[in-house]
Each structure stands twice: as C-alpha cells, then as structure tokens.
Amino acid sequence: MPDKFKRVHVVVMDSVGIGEAPDAAKFGDFDVDTFGHIAKHVGGLKMPEMGKLGLSNIREIEGIKKAEKPLAYYTKMQEASNGKDTMTGHWEIMGLYIDTPFRVFPDGFPDDLINQIEEKTGRKVIGNKPASGTEIMAELGEEHVKTGALIVYTSADSVLQIAAHEDVVPLEELYEICEFCRKITLDDPYMLGRIIARPFVGEPGAFVRTPNRHDYALKPFKPTVMDALKDGGKDVIAIGKISDIFDGEGVTESIRTKSNMDGMDQFIAVLDKDFNGMSFLNLVDFDALFGHRRDPQGYADALVDFDGRLVEVMEKLTDDDLLIITADHGNDPTYTGTDHTREFVPLLVYSPRFKNGGSELELRKTFADLGATVADNFDVKMPEYGTSFLRDLK
C-alpha cells in the first residue's frame, strides 16, 4: 500500500453532469447530458487542463481531446440516492444514502403551507414562486413595505426563503417566522432542505440585502466522513456553500465565496496552508447562474474559466496532495424546465505522485465511494456506504 496523502482536495463542479443516468426516466429526465450538450451547443469546449487529466477519456466531449496518457485516474459515478438535489449529492459523496428526496417546488408552495404561515404570523404571503432574491425584492419590495406582507419565494433547490424589510418586520420576528417554517417542513409532504431569512433595507428602487441572512438547514441524519475526519483530529476546510450544505457538521474551518472565480482564489490560498486533512470546495455558479437559467453559452464560458484556473492549482500540488474533481448532479442547460437532471458525474483523481499518469477506474455505483476513499486515506471510521478506490491509485 503506498503512503497515504497528507491532504485531499475535493472540488465539486456544482451540476456538471456527464450524461444520463440509467434511472433518469424515473426522475422525468430523457436524453440529458450537461457536459455533452453544452459542448455541442458551443461547437466544442476548450478545456485543455481537464483534457490532460482525462475528461474525454471518461467519454468524449466535443472540443476536448482524449489524452493519450491521462494524468489522472478517471471514471464516472452514479448516484444511488433517491434524489438529484445539491444536499442529496453532497451527503452521498460524504457517505450517506438518502431514501426520501428533498422536495422542490418549481411552481411555488402548496396553499396548505402558505395558509399555515399566514395564520401563524397574521401577515399575508406574496410572491410564492421561484425567483432570484434581488429580482423579487425589486418586484415586490414596495408592496411589502406598504402592506407588511411576507415575500416568500423558492429556487430550483429545496429551499423556502422569506424576504422582509428590517423596518417592516423586525429581525427577531423574521427569525421566529423562519423557525416556525423550519418546524413544519421537516417531514413529508414538504421535506425542505433549507429555510432562509433574507432581510433587506433601503427605499423602493434601491433595496439592498443586509448581512443578517440566517439559514435554518437540516443536519445530516447520521455522521458523515467529515465528522469522522474532524473526530480523528483532521482538518476539514469547507469552501463555498459546503458548510451550509452540512449545516456546519464536521467542518473545522469555513470560507465563504462570492463566485466561482472567488472560490478558486480561496481554494488556491488554502493550498498554501499547511494542514492535514481535507479541503472541500463547491463551485455553485455553474448550477445557480447557468444551469437553472438554461444558459448554455454562459455555462460553457464558466467551464472554460474554471479550466484556466487549474494551471495554478496544479502548480501548488505536491506528492502529499490528492486532487479529486467531481460533481453532485446534472443540470443540462439545453433541457426543458429549470430543474436539475439525473446524470452520471465525472470523477478525476490526480496527484503529482502518479509519475506514470492515471488509468480508468471501475464505474462507481455510488458517490459514497469518494467519501470512503477519503476516510480510508486518513484511517478514520469508514462510512456505512461506499467502497474505497485508494488501493487502485498506484
């Protein structure tokens, strides 16, 4: 068995699927292929760094040459859990199996839930649709200020958000309302991943969000590989929305990010730190800005930008580092609707230690194989699900 790695870096390209999963039809998805359809839409993707790692060796992506000698071990992973959302994907990556999917409400929330909120608060609810926070604030903020009605909205993720002006609904009241919403949406039929308080201030036409946002998430129902690492005295550095996804569980340091490029900046800064454990980065723009908005050109540009930053990442890695690049679900921007798509995700595993490059790994039947590999590397408690591929990395 080769020496273990001192640091493992997991990079999740949020929603960058690599082709329809065998059970996609069960999720209402037919002929979905995030990576493939984006590449086709733009007449080929220019991602030379991902190409060198072996992206097109997993399956050919237009514009990206197959590597004769891929630098990374490569395959794709199939999601086992019964869902295609961010929390399900990430929780499975870290060793959990999710039987009941988190619910999404692309047409707004049912009357029953809205009625409960109105009865409890004595305030009307306006909005009740998927929207970007800044847009709905501009659209309904003035009505909210005049009437005191709550702006309730969602996104393509499993989330209920409540926006309110701090002079109209005091923070304490807004937080109490969100706590009530959290309580009543823990189980079916709602099963929401997250409730978010979104306070704002200002005048019509110039409303701005304040830093007093508060998230009411669900904690993972069992310990994950992150908990095992933390309990084993290892570092778990969460970059981007990772800490939110796990509600802070198993995290030793959390670094917020403003965008994909800021995420890469923060990640590259973390690579300069001396630590023993895992860094875990989520790059959300692929999903939030381009997948849900069905913008294949914007998505393609973001992929090219990401590829361009990999040069800096590779320069910082030593033989003590293992880099794992993957995704958490698909979100084909050429598909109908605005929802995620049920897809395989890419898996690229690289270390400068691999002097002869990588080769194909077996197809992974669960994302949890990734978490199992991390646990195996650090000799901490193995997750219930997942099989380590550490021994296949020569």
UniProtKB/Swiss-Prot annotation:
One of its GO terms (biological process) is metabolic compound salvage. GO terms for molecular function: magnesium ion binding; manganese ion binding; phosphopentomutase activity. GO terms for cellular component: cytosol. SUPFAM superfamilies: Alkaline phosphatase-like, DeoB insert domain-like. InterPro entries: Alkaline_phosphatase_core_sf, DeoB, Metalloenzyme, Phosphopentomutase_DeoB_cap_sf. Its cofactor is Mn(2+). It comes from the Bacteria. Its main location: cytoplasm. Pathway: Carbohydrate degradation; 2-deoxy-D-ribose 1-phosphate degradation; D-glyceraldehyde 3-phosphate and acetaldehyde from 2-deoxy-alpha-D-ribose 1-phosphate: step 1/2. It is found in: Cytoplasm. Mn(2+) 1 binds at residues 14, 328-329. Its EC number is 5.4.2.7. Isomerase that catalyzes the conversion of deoxy-ribose 1-phosphate (dRib-1-P) and ribose 1-phosphate (Rib-1-P) to deoxy-ribose 5-phosphate (dRib-5-P) and ribose 5-phosphate (Rib-5-P), respectively. Belongs to the phosphopentomutase family. This is Phosphopentomutase. The lineage of its organism: Bacteria, Bacillati, Bacillota, Bacilli, Bacillales. The gene is deoB.
